[in-house]
Amino acid sequence: MFRFLCTLVVMIASLAGSIRAAAGAAEDVCWPLALETRYLTGNFMESRGGRFHTAIDLKTEERTGIPVLAVRDGWISRIKTAPDGYGKALYLTDEGGWTYVYAHLERLADAPRERIHARQRSTGRYRCDLHLGAGDLPVRQGEVIALSGRTGTDGPHLHFEVRDQAGMPVNPLLHGFAVQDTIAPEILAVRVWW
């Protein structure tokens, strides 16, 4: 029963956050991948082994090296590299304080790549987490900021998050990143855990 209530609370909180985000979010965004197709391989708030997925995973046609685009004008506010988790990741923050997270990248654009390589050389470690100021690495909407990859994960895809001004994840599908879905869901079973 406790588990059921916790799950219910999380679902309601995420829905409320998504509705709040959609009400205050700008819709003038571009798709984060330079692809004609828009398919998901993972959805927002899917259960993932004891946690919820706070992003959408975008299909890259089983390839790496697809140009990844800045969805809004803003700046690269954070660069992370790790052999696991997000792998190579960029955080783009816009003027309104919204943050867009791109993870599992193969290669970063020149400016962020030079910044993270300098940090890696100075620390002697591959795993780095570099926070940047508003004027450090500005980007324009539609600019190529990276290439898609599979770092930190098994299969190639783009893990894409939208976070509000408080840093809370919101549903990207309600924030201008919708995909056309013409297949109605079919409920095959319902399971309740106690």
Task: Outline where the language-model segments fall.
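A short linear boundary/processing microfeature
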Residues: E46, R107-L108, D164, A178
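Surface-exposed, glycine-biased beta-strand/turn segments
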Residues: I19-A89, T93-G96, R125-G135, R140-E143, ...
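A cross-domain feature marking catalytic cores of carbohydrate-active enzymes
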Residues: H104, V162, A189
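Bacterial N-terminal signal peptides
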Residues: C6-A16
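Positively charged n-region of N-terminal signal peptides that target proteins for export
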Residues: M1-F4
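Short beta-strand-turn/beta-hairpin segments enriched in glycine/proline and small hydrophobics
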Residues: T54, L90-Y126
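Short, charged/polar, Gly/Pro-enriched secondary-structure boundary elements
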Residues: I12, G167-V170
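A short hydrophobic beta-strand segment most commonly corresponding to one strand
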Residues: H159-G167
